């Protein structure tokens, strides 16, 4: 994020009723913010509202990870940049990934202790490995902001702190 993020009037509605807000939020570049609260307090709703407002400036790790079970971890991570390439490039990457893409994804997965799972189908991953694959996808997006909704809930202590 190059400039401070200023959001005013964030409100969430469910069934026509306001369930959150209106809220104002100011975030400076480099800030790390954690939302803490009881179940049902609106944390996930607030994250979705922020993501809807900032769009492509943010990478999102949702609670529902959105992994494609039939595809290997590489392709699930690579999906973060699909819109940066044309359809032919993406199709070629599905068949035989380019070296630069393989190296970039492998580097991120290495940071997440997942290098050995590069070509494993997402369906064969444990819950914690699935979360790390989704985190890898968000990091590969290389957006100015990272929004994560319970991103380490299935990770053990040492991995969660990493």
Give short role names for the model-derived ranges.
Residues 121-125, 129:
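Conserved ABC ATPase signature
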């Amino acid at each position: 994020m190059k400039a401070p993020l200023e959001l005013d009037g964030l409100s969430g509605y469910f069934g026509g009723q306001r369930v959150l807000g209106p809220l104002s939020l100011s975030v400076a570049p480099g800030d790390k913010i954690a939302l803490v609260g009881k179940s049902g307090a609106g944390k996930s709703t607030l994250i979705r509202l922020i993501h809807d407002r900032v769009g492509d400036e943010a990478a999102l790790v949702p609670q529902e990870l959105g992994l494609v079970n039939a595809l290997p971890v590489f392709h699930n991570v690579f999906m973060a940049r699909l819109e940066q390439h044309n359809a032919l490039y993406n199709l070629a990457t599905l068949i035989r990934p380019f070296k630069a893409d393989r190296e970039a994804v492998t580097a991120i997965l290495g940071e997440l202790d997942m290098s050995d799972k590069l070509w494993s189908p997402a369906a064969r991953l444990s819950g914690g490995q699935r979360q790390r694959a989704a985190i890898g996808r968000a990091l590969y997006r290389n957006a100015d902001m990272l929004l994560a909704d319970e991103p380490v809930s299935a990770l053990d202590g040492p991995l969660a702190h990493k």
